[in-house]
C-alpha cells in the first residue's frame, strides 16, 4: 500500500515543498523515516504514532517506510508531522474517499502542522515561506493548524483550511466544501507605539533634523555624546517618522519574523522593525547562522532600524561584519553545505560615549579614564565602518532651559513625518524607472546623473574634498545626504546651502573626534 502527500520545510528563509512517500508492506512492525531528516523530524515517528491512535484511527502494525524528498535538502520542520500522518492514513485506507479522487486531492494539496500526542495541531514556524514556495509549484490548497491559517488568508491565490486536530483535518479532506472560510480582520493592531514621540525630546533640535534626513533618504547615523544626553531617545523614536510599510514590505517582514519564530501575532506585521541587540551578542546572532541558518538581527531589522547602542563595547569583528550589509543591503551566510543570501535593508544607528566613563571633553564633569583606556576604547570602531556612515551627530547634554521649553517649541513626530514623506515623494518620482527608491541606495555610477548638482557647486565640493581628505565612498555619501536635504527643501537641484548643511554632519569636534576620526577632521 502506497500514498504520496506533500508537506514543506524551510531552508534559510525559503520554503521547500517536500514529497512525503509512505509505503506500508508486510513484515515486522517498523516505522522508518528516510530522506535526510533532522532530529525533530526523526522524533515525529512517536508523535505521529500516538496522534493517530489518540485520534480514533488504527496505526498499522506493519513495516512502514516514509521517504522525504528531495533527498539533498535537510528536513528540519516539525510541520512534517501532519503530512506523514495523512500519508499513513491514506496508505492504510482509513481516509474514506475513492482512490482516484483521493489521489487527485493529495497531488494538489499541501499539509503543514506539528502534532501533539493527543492529535491536536500546533503552530508551525515559517508557514508563509512554505506557502509562497507552494505557489511556485502550482499547489493552491493548504491544510494546516487553525493557529496558522489566519496568516495564509493574506495570500489570495491560496485556499487554506485550518483545524485544531488531526481528526478534523481528515474530515476536511473528505468534505472540504462544508468548511466555511472565516474572514480575518487585519486591523493593524501592530501600529507604531503612540506613547513615544519626538515631542518628548527636548533640546536636541539638531539631532531631530539629522533623524529627519536619515528617515527621508535612508541614511546611516552615528551619535556621540555623554550618558543621558538623549541618544537612545532619538534612536528609538525613528520608526515613528518612517513611512508605513507597503503590502509587499509587510509580507516580507512577516515572513522573516515567522521563520525566526518571533511572530507575536498571527497577522502581518504593520510597524517597521526596531532591533537593539545587546553588546554581548554573538556574530551569528547579528548576521545570522546557527545549525538551521536562522536570520540574524540585521535581517530582522530589514525595512526598519538597527540600533547599535554602546557601539565601542561590541567586539570589533562583530561591528566589522556590518560592512557588507551597510553597502549592499544583503548578507551572505555560508554554511558547510550551502550559502544563504538574506535581505538586510535597514537604517543603522550607532551610538557611543566619547570614552569608557562617558565624560571625555565634558565641561562640567571630569573624565577619569587613563590615556590607555581612551586609546583602546576610541579605536574600537574601524575606519571602513565609519566610512559607511552618512551622518555624524554630537549629542550634548541639554541645558536646564532646554528641559523647560514649552511643548509647542519642540518638533513632534507628526511634524517630522510630514517632512519625511515630502522628501520620499520626490525620490519616488525621481527614481520611478530605477530599481532603487531612496537616495541612500544610489549606486556610485548614478550619483552625478540623478543628483542634479548645480554647476556652481563643484567649486565648493572640490575644496571640501581636498581639505578634508575624503575617500571616494565618503564623498559619495556627502552628495547623497546633500540630495536628501535638497528634497526636504523641495528643490530640484543641490545648492551650496544643501552641501554646507550636509558638511555639518560630517564634522566632529576635536574632543570626541578620536573615535575613528583624527585631528578634528571630517570623516
Label the model's feature ranges.
Residues 303, 309-310, 321:
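Walker B catalytic acidic pair
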Residues 40-45, 60, 67-77, 292-293, ...:
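Basic, amphipathic alpha-helical bundle interface domains used for macromolecular binding and assembly
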Residues 225, 288, 310:
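The Walker A (P-loop) glycine that initiates the GxxxxGKT/S ATP-binding motif of P-loop NTPases
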Residues 1-222, 229, 334, 475, ...:
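Peripheral, non-AAA+ core regions of ATP-driven protein-machinery
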Residues 212, 267-268, 273, 284-306, ...:
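Conserved alpha-helical scaffold flanking the Walker A/P-loop in AAA+ ATPase domains
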Residues 223-262, 328:
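Walker A/P-loop
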Residues 118, 308-315, 358:
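Catalytic P-loop NTPase motifs of RecA-like helicase/translocase cores
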Residues 59-62, 105-106, 136-138, 156, ...:
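Short loop/turn elements that form and flank the Walker-type P-loop nucleotide-binding site
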Amino acid at each position: 500500500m502506497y500514498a504520496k502527500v506533500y508537506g514543506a520545510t524551510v531552508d534559510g528563509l525559503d520554503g521547500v515543498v517536500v514529497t512525503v512517500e509512505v509505503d506500508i508492506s508486510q513484515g515486522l512492525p517498523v516505522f522508518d523515516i528516510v530522506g535526510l531528516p533532522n532530529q525533530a523530524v526523526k522524533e515525529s515517528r512517536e508523535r505521529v504514532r500516538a496522534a493517530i491512535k489518540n485520534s480514533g484511527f488504527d496505526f498499522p502494525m506493519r513495516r512502514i517506510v516514509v521517504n522525504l524528498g528531495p533527498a539533498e535538502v535537510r528536513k528540519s520542520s516539525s510541520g512534517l508531522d501532519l503530512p506523514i500522518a495523512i500519508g499513513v492514513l491514506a496508505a492504510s485506507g482509513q481516509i474514506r474517499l475513492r482512490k482516484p479522487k483521493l489521489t487527485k486531492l493529495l497531488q494538489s494539496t499541501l499539509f503543514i502542522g506539528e502534532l501533539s500526542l493527543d492529535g491536536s495541531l500546533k503552530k508551525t514556524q515559517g508557514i508563509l515561506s512554505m506557502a509562497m514556495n507552494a505557489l511556485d509549484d502550482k499547489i493552491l490548497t493548504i491544510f494546516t493548524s487553525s493557529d496558522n491559517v489566519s496568516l495564509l488568508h493574506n495570500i489570495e491565490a491560496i485556499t487554506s483550511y485550518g483545524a485544531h486536530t488531526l481528526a478534523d483535518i481528515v474530515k476536511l479532506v473528505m468534505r472540504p466544501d462544508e468548511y466555511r472560510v472565516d474572514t480575518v480582520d487585519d486591523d493593524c493592531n501592530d501600529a507604531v507605539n503612540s506613547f513615544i514621540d519626538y515631542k518628548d525630546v527636548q533640546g536636541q533640535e539638531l539631532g531631530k533634523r539629522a533623524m529627519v534626513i536619515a528617515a527621508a533618504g535612508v541614511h546611516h547615523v552615528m551619535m556621540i555624546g555623554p550618558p543621558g544626553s538623549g541618544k537612545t531617545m532619538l534612536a528609538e523614536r525613528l520608526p515613528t517618522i518612517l513611512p508605513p510599510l507597503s503590502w509587499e514590505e509587510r509580507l516580507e517582514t512577516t515572513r522573516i519574523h515567522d521563520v525566526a519564530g518571533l511572530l507575536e501575532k498571527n497577522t502581518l506585521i504593520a510597524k517597521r522593525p526596531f532591533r537593539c541587540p545587546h553588546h554581548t551578542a554573538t556574530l551569528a546572532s547579528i548576521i545570522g547562522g546557527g545549525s538551521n541558518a536562522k536570520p540574524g538581527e540585521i535581517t530582522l531589522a530589514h525595512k526598519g532600524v538597527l540600533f547599535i547602542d554602546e557601539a565601542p563595547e561590541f567586539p570589533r569583528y562583530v561591528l566589522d561584519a556590518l560592512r557588507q550589509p551597510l553597502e549592499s543591503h544583503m548578507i551572505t551566510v555560508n554554511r558547510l553545505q550551502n550559502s544563504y543570501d538574506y535581505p538586510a535593508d535597514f537604517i543603522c544607528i550607532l551610538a557611543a560615549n566619547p570614552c569608557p566613563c562617558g565624560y571625555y571633553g565634558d565641561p562640567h564633569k571630569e573624565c577619569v579614564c587613563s590615556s590607555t583606556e581612551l586609546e583602546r576604547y576610541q579605536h574600537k570602531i574601524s575606519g571602513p565602518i565609519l566610512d559607511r556612515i552618512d551622518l555624524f551627530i554630537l549629542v550634548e547634554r541639554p541645558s536646564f532651559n532646554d528641559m523647560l521649553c514649552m511643548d509647542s517649541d519642540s518638533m513632534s513626530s507628526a511634524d517630522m513625518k510630514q517632512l519625511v514623506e515630502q522628501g520620499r515623494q520626490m525620490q519616488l518620482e525621481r527614481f520611478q524607472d530605477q530599481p532603487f527608491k531612496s537616495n541612500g541606495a544610489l549606486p556610485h555610477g548614478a550619483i552625478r546623473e540623478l543628483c542634479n548638482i548645480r554647476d556652481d557647486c563643484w567649486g565648493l565640493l572640490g575644496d571640501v574634498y581636498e581639505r578634508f581628505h575624503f575617500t571616494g565612498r565618503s564623498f559619495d555619501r556627502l552628495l547623497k545626504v546633500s540630495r536628501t536635504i535638497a528634497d526636504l527643501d523641495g528643490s530640484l537641484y543641490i545648492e551650496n546651502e544643501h552641501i554646507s548643511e550636509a558638511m555639518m554632519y560630517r564634522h566632529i569636534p576635536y574632543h570626541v573626534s578620536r573615535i575613528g576620526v583624527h585631528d578634528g577632521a571630517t570623516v
